[in-house]
């Protein structure tokens, strides 16, 4: 009798309209209940029964109700699900399949079934890619997912690599080789095969894309010739190989191995500047003065070169430092190394005075066994040979930036604008509070930024430097010239790694247009978007595999008395993030591990300090001693505790 009652319908509509609603993001907990966070300011409790309708990370609209003086959120409408495509581990029970997402706050198994095209018979512990297809807030009875791809079985030793690549939807293998002949008839190449070019790389490097040759001019200056491998001689624009390289955008370097942008036949053979092999290259010649200034005689050309020696960073560094365990093969190579060292010193001095030089940070290299186990982690400090190559490549990239700007007005540029204009006032306030006077407007200029960086680099600690980093913008990829504040340079365009970076291949084609006097087309903006997105995904993949391997490596140390020296890299409300200096692992120290009485300890991201009873006990960039308290393998988190 009530179902068609207009008064009842009107009353329901009124109640619906009058019920307060909020939109926010669900935050799950390990205890079954959750919270709806609204604008990062306010949160509402979601009881366990209501949490069964949603997932951590879902953006929803919820109705608000009061229960025993507490405001409770009841999920009503799904705005945007947290999970769409994801990876997880399959559970098989009585021929029924479910999948647990590989995420620290998603512990519940989701019912699932393979899509029709997938023929793999899933077993307990298998890793898979899944797509959510049902959600309770969409009117479905329960969550459900489709299994769309089998990744690997649970016993595979290389799970960290395969799962991470699948998570980020990245390729597992090198691209297939397509028949590819040298294709540059319109390009005249000069023969430089008689010159004593050398490559300097790691011992294991196969994709060598730069070779160097120096001529002493006898007046204190040098003529530096940088030869860069020329894959665009084999890869025609918009060909199958080119489209593959454009999609991949970069060679993906992961612990233990890489997945190249180009087929290995090209990257490790035909284009690689192997010793005593004739190779097509693009060449940049520039005179460098005794003071390290790049002269304005920059010239690009196409050439043939033949590297006379594959040198290794550590060998060259040892020899230059007076350790004679290794010797150059002849006096000509010895002379090249000596001249390159002089250029490096001159350019480094020039950049310290007129641009910016990054502080040296060590690289950490995983030494892996045949089954992917971590045998050791090697700390590789940047040595003189690394700096030689770095200075020559920076010089070459500055030359390309200037040439592209002058002749075309476009290219693939690396741009960094320093401080975010919206945050520069805050940066100036933090600097002032720490005794450094700074004019916000001056900080937005390249000279002002460089002056500040030099001042910060001269301070005894990294505290202030780390405090103001959050007010800076990220480096971007642009098709038009712009400054690179991080390097302290007016313009910067890379072309020195075309085997492993698609943006460098684009710049090669533009430089060839300048060399031949042909028309060049400005790169599409979509290319910069693809490059930026792939760079982000590759970095996340490298970090994720690293976290997994660090967890495996440090698990035996959990609960032991082994001490590690660590640097505080971030302070959050919940505790400290530290980097272990012996191996590069990042660990978290919860605030209760710092001081037992929670109300007496304040961890402040704003001030970059930890205070106990008002006294500062830790600051960002401090070095402290820690022990490993726990390693959570399911989330790959390392939990540390300060040594009292």
Swiss-Prot record:
| Chief place where the protein resides | cytoplasm
**What EC identifiers does the entry list?**
3.1.13.1
Domain S1 motif: from-to ranges: 561-643
The record's section on Pfam families has: OB_RNB, RNB, S1
> Which keywords accompany this UniProt record?
Cytoplasm, Exonuclease, Hydrolase, Nuclease, RNA-binding
One record GO biological process: mRNA catabolic process
Which compartments is it annotated to reside in? Cytoplasm
What general EC class does the enzyme of this chain belong to?
hydrolase
- Domain RNB: from-to ranges: 189-516
Job of this protein: Involved in mRNA degradation. Hydrolyzes single-stranded polyribonucleotides processively in the 3' to 5' direction.
Report the PANTHER family cross-referenced here. Answer: EXORIBONUCLEASE 2, RIBONUCLEASE
Q: Which family does it belong to?
A: Belongs to the RNR ribonuclease family. RNase II subfamily.
User: What is the protein's name according to its record?
Assistant: Exoribonuclease 2
Taxonomy, top ranks, is: Bacteria, Pseudomonadati, Pseudomonadota, Gammaproteobacteria, Enterobacterales
What would be the name of the gene that encodes this protein?
rnb
